[in-house]
Amino acid sequence: MAPHQNVRPETVLKRTDELIAVGQQDAALELLHETVSARKARTTSVATLEPIVARFVQLSVDLRKGKIIKDGLHQYKKIVQSTNVNAIEPVIKQFLSLAEQRVTDAQAQADKIADEEEADDLEAEETPEDLLLATVSSEDTKDRTDRRVVTPWLKFLWEAYRSVLDVLRNNSKLEVIYQQVVEQAFNFCLKFSRKTEFRRLCELLRSHLQTTAQKGPNAPPVTATSVDLSDADTLQRYLDTRFSQLNVAVKLELWQEAFRSVEDVHTLLTVSKRPAKPLMMGNYYENLARIFLVAGNYLFHAAAWNKLFHLLSQSPRGAIPVSEYQRVASFVLLSALAIPHNSSAEDRYRNTRLTGLLNLQRTPTRDALLKSALSRNILAHVKPEIKALYKTLEVDFHPLSIRAKLTPVVGAIAEAPEFKPYFAPLYQVILTRLFQQLSQVYESVKLDFVIQLATFPAPFSATPLEIEQFIVRACAQGELAIKIDHDQRSVLFEEVRAATGSASLQDTPIEIVRTQLSRLGRTLSVADPLNSAEAREQQYVAALTTAQDNAEREHAETLARRAEIEARKAQAEAERAQREEEEARKRAQRLLDEELAEKERLAAEQHARELERIRKEQDAIREEEKKKLAEEINAKGIITIDLDKLEGLDTNALRKMQVDQLAKETKELGDRLRVTARRIDHTERAYRMEEIKLVEDDFVKQKQRDREIYDTRIKLIKDTAKAEHDAKVELAKRLQRAVPFYKSFRDDIRVKREAEFTRLREEAVKNLAEAKAARIEEVKAKRIADAKRAEEEAKAAAEAEAKAAAEAEAKAKAEQEMREKLLAEKKAREEANARADAAYEKQRQKEAELEAKLEAKRAGFSGAGRQAPPSGGYVPPSRREGGYVPPSRRGDAGAAPGAGSGGYTPPSRREGGGGGYVPPSRREGGGGGYVPPSRREGGSGAGSGGRYIPPSQRN
């Protein structure tokens, strides 16, 4: 991965060249992309970025990375948006030029491959594989080569156009280059016949226009570079683009898309303040005529030709060639003659819509178009055969002579191939007029006679069955009222005539009787019944009086009618504007819905393509694994697998085949080894039986050979050792002369090294002593600083301790005062309790005395023999069960009944606490009361005798 973070824009090109040189084109492209997308690039000058972006575009095209280049162009547009947005134009042109050049190169390569395949072997016959491929596929070798070589670059070029249009859209400063790219995209679709891409391109342009013209809360924010459709030049550019779109749609024969383009052009024409160019409008009407002709709408087809002729007739004299004028005039008259008689009875809403597209005030009719053409003296400009056809059909039409008159005319028209689309509708018109005229003359005729009259030379020829079918269809549509009697072989004409507007040959007898009175009135009105001058004078005076009386009324009616006409016209105009606005809204909504549907469809297609891509990748991986495994198996030589016939096999099957083959070969090898071992065993046994007699002789010979070899090797070793020893002795003698010089040089070196060592050791000892002294000084200074810091801390601790002791003493004094106060309160309560006990004792003594007296009285009564008091008499409280018992008598065993039943006891005499108040300092177990810190055990001040100890000094 290339380093992206710290690369400056000025060094990017150099780094890119280095990466490309080592074959890392993808890393180089990523480096360029991140350079353009980095935040630092926004502050870089455009002149510095231009070569980087140019290299980025070139490398993206080479690697065919459409998505990366689209994002890069968007980032570059953001950079140059505020400074010089036109700087993006050369980048766009370079991008499209490179992409188009790649397509051209791919086409040349495909042609070269096709030529090589064709010229590979001129005498070779077709192989069975070629025959099978030709059978199952309709493509030839050239088509397959194009799909493999050219199609990927075509797809890349199409994506390039889409990406560029997305970058350039809705920017007023880029309108010109936007229009140029659209024209290039149109030429691309036309050159390569890309009909699907052309439809998508048209939808893309409509969505761009819709976004530009959108208003309301959902509209994009208006900026300084937003496109303004109210500008005449901008609208003219959009009109030019739509005219080009219409031309390409017609050339590609995409009639539905062409009609939608016509609607786009008409919508822009309605909002344009500048009239369109006559040449463009002429092209518009001619394309519209072709669309209507393909759709079979001959009425509006003729109306479009009529508008084109009207446009040409307004051109300056000599501006239009005579041949072109004659061609258009001939098409105008011929298309008007080919209009069926019932064409005006079609859908009214559709006719209104098509009328608006032709900029007509009212729905055209056949008669109106013919009158309009004749009013411009069109017969003087049309071809002679068309003029003769008009006179035959509209002026001199007669059912009995029509065949003879049309034969030479039809032959002349049939020679012109451009008139071929009008043969069928003209024949329908001729038959309709023929049967209408026959119905005015005859009540019944022979069927053979009718078929003879309706049979014309080619291209107007028809079979009798086709003629009968035409009659049936015309009757079903209400054009004719005819019955065919096949038994009598006759044709019966009804009396009802279709209101076709065609001229009548003569009136029927019924018509003569019905119109007799009206004809008589018209005849009498022509005759002058008043012959005298007096009568004529009276008539004149009466007429003058009537005229004077009616003049004012007629004038008022005229004004009222004019006002009503103006009101209706204004209402119609308002309704038309409202209708157009509603249609525009519906059209915009429809475009939005279609755009959403298209986005959903594209997303679904993208998802499907992604799934298909994943599936293909998985299949490719499996195929690669199968192929690799098959190659490994073939390399091992276990079995031989044809790499071209791996269909239906997977890796498990290949491994199973390998294992089965190994098992089979192992079994076969074992069988062969057993047979071979048995055979070798017998052979070896026979060999050894034969070798026994030869072994002793061979042993003696072997000993002799070994001795000879041993003696030879010993002699060689001795000779070699002696030669080496002599060479070393000679070398020692030669080196002995250099020993004194060696010793002298060694001693000199040793003396120098010892002196250097002594010097370095002394320097090291000196440096060590200096470092030691510095270290000692540093330690002393540190210890002094530590002592000062410890002294300051001790002083601070002493101050804190003194402060804490003072606080503890004050707290102890407060606690002592609290204890004294509590003791005083206790003493007061005890004295009060003592007084209460004394009062109680005195009361008890009184009660005892009273009780004694009562006892004495009772004893006296009983001794005197008086009756005892009733059982319900008075009993003192002390003797009642559950009665009151003084506190002093409660609790002992000999207490009176009711003792211990809950009588009152002073809190100070209660046992176990009894609920009496006990000071917190005397409570056992803490009791939850307050205990001074000096008396707490295990507290933070334990062992300090109540003195406060700071937390830092506690153990």
Swiss-Prot record:
PROSITE patterns: PCI. Its main location: cytoplasm. Residues 325-498 form the PCI domain. The keyword Acetylation does not apply. Residues 789-955 are annotated as: Disordered. Residues 789-858 have a biased composition (Basic and acidic residues). Disulfide bonds: none annotated. Signal peptide: none annotated. It is found in: Cytoplasm. GO terms for biological process: formation of cytoplasmic translation initiation complex; translation reinitiation. GO terms for cellular component: cytoplasmic stress granule; eukaryotic 43S preinitiation complex; eukaryotic 48S preinitiation complex; eukaryotic translation initiation factor 3 complex, eIF3e; eukaryotic translation initiation factor 3 complex, eIF3m; multi-eIF complex. It comes from the Eukaryota. GO terms for molecular function: mRNA binding; translation initiation factor activity. Keywords: Coiled coil, Cytoplasm, Initiation factor, Protein biosynthesis, RNA-binding. InterPro entries: EIF3A (IPR027512), eIF3a_PCI_TPR-like (IPR054711), PCI_dom (IPR000717). Residues 96-127, 533-636, 752-860 form a coiled coil. Belongs to the eIF-3 subunit A family. Component of the eukaryotic translation initiation factor 3 (eIF-3) complex. RNA-binding component of the eukaryotic translation initiation factor 3 (eIF-3) complex, which is involved in protein synthesis of a specialized repertoire of mRNAs and, together with other initiation factors, stimulates binding of mRNA and methionyl-tRNAi to the 40S ribosome. The eIF-3 complex specifically targets and initiates translation of a subset of mRNAs involved in cell proliferation. This is Eukaryotic translation initiation factor 3 subunit A. It comes from Yarrowia lipolytica (strain CLIB 122 / E 150).
